[in-house]
């Protein structure tokens, strides 16, 4: 832009330079991703390659069909208009290209962009919700202790205070050991302490209702990972997020369905402004379409 200002508007080519300057001003706000580069970045050429076209540019996503087959298939079907929705008001069945025209309704800059919320879709959520497809052992959660050697709580659990620790860790442990009353605490103290020191993150998440599988691999959530949002175990619908940074504290609780292979710059642009999911924001980025291109 500074270079452009050096040109005099008295040139006969004034219109050209003004148009070029306008292009340079606007172009940083859009991102351009390349199909050839996207294909080259794929881990497996047989995986589905999706093109997400947004108001900020293109994002190419390699879906990991071998790691989350059911959830990947549902995502493709939603994108391609293969899932039926019954509208009680219209008394009719529709098969919309679900994501077309939706927005990234939740944005936490430098952390995550989230889209596909059924709360913002006139037809709501597809039924049924799908089960998680997560291999906690592949993630190493069976080897991560809840308590470190100095007695501090594993930071990936994001436990904020003693009350939360009691609710999330101690109460389910008591139930597993059959401790139901205060009077039973003292006789069971040794068992409680032993089990507490041996408690893993995987086991704690199982207390919370997560069920893990070992018949396929699972990768952790890192920058560029595409995973399904949920409101609890085995509650996977259409809503998804793209991680803008490594986020290992999310591992084991969200089913990973893909990875961005081209267009992370676009994702960063979308993530440049915080968006509150509780209210519509006309400045939020639009998903024009999501299509399989291979």
What are these regions (language model features)?
Residues 5, 16-17, 31-33:
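Short, low-structural-confidence N-terminal segments
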Residues 30-294:
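Cyclophilin-like peptidyl-prolyl cis-trans isomerases
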Residues 1-12:
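N-terminal secretory signal peptides that target proteins for export/translocation
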Residues 15-27:
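Bacterial N-terminal signal peptides
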């Amino acid at each position: 832009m500074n270079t452009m200002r050096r040109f005099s508007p008295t040139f006969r080519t004034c219109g050209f330079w003004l148009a070029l300057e306008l292009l340079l001003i606007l172009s940083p706000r859009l991102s351009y991703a390349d199909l050839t580069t996207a294909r080259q970045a794929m881990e497996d050429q047989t995986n589905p390659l999706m093109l997400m076209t947004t108001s900020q540019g293109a994002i190419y996503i390699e879906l990991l069909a071998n790691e989350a087959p059911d959830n990947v298939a549902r995502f493709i079907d939603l994108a391609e208009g293969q899932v039926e929705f019954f509208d009680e008001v219209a008394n009719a069945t529709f098969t919309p290209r679900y994501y077309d025209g939706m927005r990234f309704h939740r944005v936490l800059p430098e952390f995550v962009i989230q889209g596909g919320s059924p709360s913002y879709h006139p037809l709501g959520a597809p039924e049924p919700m799908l089960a998680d497809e997560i291999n906690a052992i592949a993630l190493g959660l069976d080897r991560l202790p809840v308590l470190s050697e100095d007695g501090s709580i594993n930071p990936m659990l994001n436990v904020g205070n003693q009350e939360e620790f009691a609710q999330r860790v101690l109460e389910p442990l008591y139930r597993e050991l059959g401790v139901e009353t205060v009077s039973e605490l003292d006789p069971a103290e040794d068992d409680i302490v032993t089990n507490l020191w041996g408690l893993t993150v995987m086991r704690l998440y199982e207390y919370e209702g997560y069920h893990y599988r070992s018949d396929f691999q699972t990768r952790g959530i890192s920058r560029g990972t595409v995973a399904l949002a949920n409101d609890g175990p085995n509650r996977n619908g259409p809503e998804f997020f793209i991680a803008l940074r490594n986020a290992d504290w999310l591992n084991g609780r969200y089913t990973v369905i893909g990875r961005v292979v081209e267009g992370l710059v676009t994702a960063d642009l979308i993530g440049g402004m915080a968006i509150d999911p509780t209210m519509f924001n006309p400045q939020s980025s639009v998903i024009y379409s999501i299509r399989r291109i291979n």
